Amino acid sequence: MNVQITPDELYAHRPDVLLPPDPEFVEEYAQAVQFGREVASRSSIAFVFLARNSMPWLPQTLALIEQTGACFESWSAFAMENDSVDSTKDVLTEWADNRQRQASLNTYARPHLSHTMTQERTVALAEYRNACRQWVQDGDSVDLVCVLDSDSWGGWSVDGLLTSVAHIARGDWWGLASYSWCEMNTPHGPYAAGYDAWACRWTWWNQRSHDWFHHLHLPVGSRPVEMNSAFGQLAVYRADAYLRGRYSGATCEHVPYHRSIAEHPDTRGRFGFNPSSRVVSFWVPEHGRQHQPN
């Protein structure tokens, strides 16, 4: 991807800079971060992610995994890669140590359908997500699993992720998705929106119009909201719940996965959307703004 972004833009779009806690919830947010750190320090976590043509964002993602993992007593990570034609395979090869950091590099000669909702795409994504799940199942037992995307431009807030750890530890949540911010180009100029609307199902499961989701900007620091499904490029799960699920490609793969967990007879608790766990997905670069119509 040939994107011209300045260092100042990158800094301005860090989640903690762009999306700070709402003044009403500053104290509650700080308490959740602190408790999340305490829980993490005695917990284990596995990070799993898909990767295809994830440059130039992949090194930042890997660095954030290291930074987040350092908050935990122990951590491991697994990348499921396929069909990259940029330097993604090379970066993952250098990163992997076949112990704590593992990568599966694959060439399936499948088309790159990054902006479609066809089953050709969703079935493949479900296959890759299930490979991640199998890796967790086959590995050492962990307390938590973090499922993430490897190509978010601004990455995620480590403190925000820790609030999900806190809410899961002291509440009845079996999993929490993230608030994923993006900026879209429109004829009227850039527009800030919620990203990953297709993965969201609030009180329903069937696919409906999700235009409303793009306007959903809940206050950072406010408490999680129960939803049937959501993702936002990063979600944290109790490991026992994560392993009960099974991805399928009938629609966005996260939806049947979350439904399979929710309907499992051994699942306790609920799933939700955490406004404090922030991911910055993408934005309109400064050089692109120069060409916006008046």
Language-model regions, residue ranges each:
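Short beta-strand-to-loop acidic/aromatic patch adjacent to the donor-nucleotide binding site
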Residues: 140-155
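Active-site-proximal specificity loops/subdomain of glycosyltransferases
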Residues: 91-142
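Short loop->beta transition adjacent to catalytic acidic/histidine clusters or analogous donor-positioning motifs
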Residues: 43-45, 68-78, 100-102
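Catalytic phosphate/metal-binding cores of nucleic-acid and nucleotide-processing enzymes, i.e., regions
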Residues: 53-61, 95-96, 152, 168-169
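C-terminal catalytic/acceptor-binding lobe
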Residues: 3-19, 215-294
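N-proximal low-complexity "stem/linker" segments adjacent to membrane-targeting elements
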Residues: 2-67
